[in-house]
A protein has these predicted regions:
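Terminal transmembrane helical anchor/hairpin motif
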Residues: 164-248
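A structural motif at transmembrane helix-loop-helix junctions in multipass membrane proteins
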Residues: 130-177
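Selective transmembrane-helix segments that form parts of the transport pathway or gating/packing helices
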Residues: 83-119
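Aromatic- and glycine-rich beta-strand/loop motifs that create alpha-glucan
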Residues: 1-20, 239
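Short, hydrophobic transmembrane alpha-helix segments
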Residues: 32-44
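Helix-loop-helix units of permease transmembrane domains in multi-pass membrane transporters
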Residues: 64-95
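Short alpha-helical transmembrane interface motifs in multi-pass membrane proteins
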Residues: 44, 54-59, 88-89, 117-122, ...
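Long, hydrophobic alpha-helical segments
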Residues: 45-69, 98
Length: 255
């Protein structure tokens, strides 16, 4: 497993696509910090990159890499190594590579310009989202053998969590605004890793008051230490659960 992980990391870090992704993050981060006088506003701008661009690149790159290395996986399956270890090694290599690139592209500028708790939360949220969407990418890739369908499913998952889910939540809130929705709002936020990361950042920036009723509910629950542990626990679950499911699927899959 560790040898596979090491090989994957070495292979990915030479990828021109990943180098371009890292340079893009560095350029965006340094540009925003250089042009903005207020670091808090710059963090808000970077939050959009972390919540939208980072999950998109993570899930698309991971899916593409998995299918491109499928013949390599088929070769290793014939060796005396368990399929579960093979898949976990592949996942660890891809995930660690993308995390390293994110930490260089976003983490270094944040450490230089915003070395505070808000900056740390931005980096931690981005790292969690990177791992989450790599997990979802592997789930989509193992679920279907066809590369086009796998990439399509990955893009559909990203579109659902990044854009469509918020629209569905708004429709639910407007449709049932005459009913007490405190617990429902928390439950709906728990079902989306991007929303969880956004809430953690908003709580750190203390701008929940600008969000009205929803912000008050978030502040009351997620603003507490219990809410923080709850959010981190759910994000960890979003990372681990898809990997466990796809590892079991891969172990039984007919290659």
């Amino acid at each position: 497993m560790f040898k596979i992980c090491k090989y994957v990391i070495y292979d990915i870090l030479r990828s021109k696509v990943l180098i371009a992704y890292m340079l893009f993050l560095l350029a965006i981060s340094f540009s925003l910090f250089a042009l903005g006088d207020d670091t808090a506003k710059t963090i808000v701008s970077l939050m959009s990159v972390v919540l939208i661009i980072v999950p998109l690149i993570s899930i698309v790159f991971s899916t593409t890499y998995f299918y491109n290395s499928y013949e390599f996986l088929e070769l290793l399956v014939a060796q005396p190594i368990s399929r579960r270890s093979l898949l976990l090694g592949e996942y660890a290599g891809v995930a660690l590579s993308l995390v390293v690139v994110f930490l260089v592209g976003i983490g270094i500028p944040v450490c230089l310009y915003a070395p505070n708790s808000t900056g740390a939360m931005l980096v931690l949220s981005g790292t969690a989202l990177t791992l989450t969407f790599v997990s979802l990418a592997f789930f989509a890739s193992v679920a279907t053998r066809d590369k086009a369908r796998g990439i399509g499913l990955s893009l559909l998952l990203w579109f659902y969590f990044a854009i469509l889910y918020d629209a569905i939540v708004l429709i639910i809130l407007f449709s049932f605004n005459d009913y007490p929705l405190d617990k429902a709002v928390i439950a709906l936020a728990s079902l989306n890793p991007i929303d969880l990361s956004r809430i953690l950042l908003l709580m750190k920036m203390d701008i929940a008051a600008l969000m009205g009723f929803t912000g008050a509910v978030y502040k009351h629950f997620f603003g507490t230490m219990y809410g923080l542990f709850y959010s981190c626990g759910l994000l960890l679950l979003w990372i681990v659960l898809p990997v466990i499911i796809c590892a079991r699927m891969f172990a039984r899959k007919d290659l």
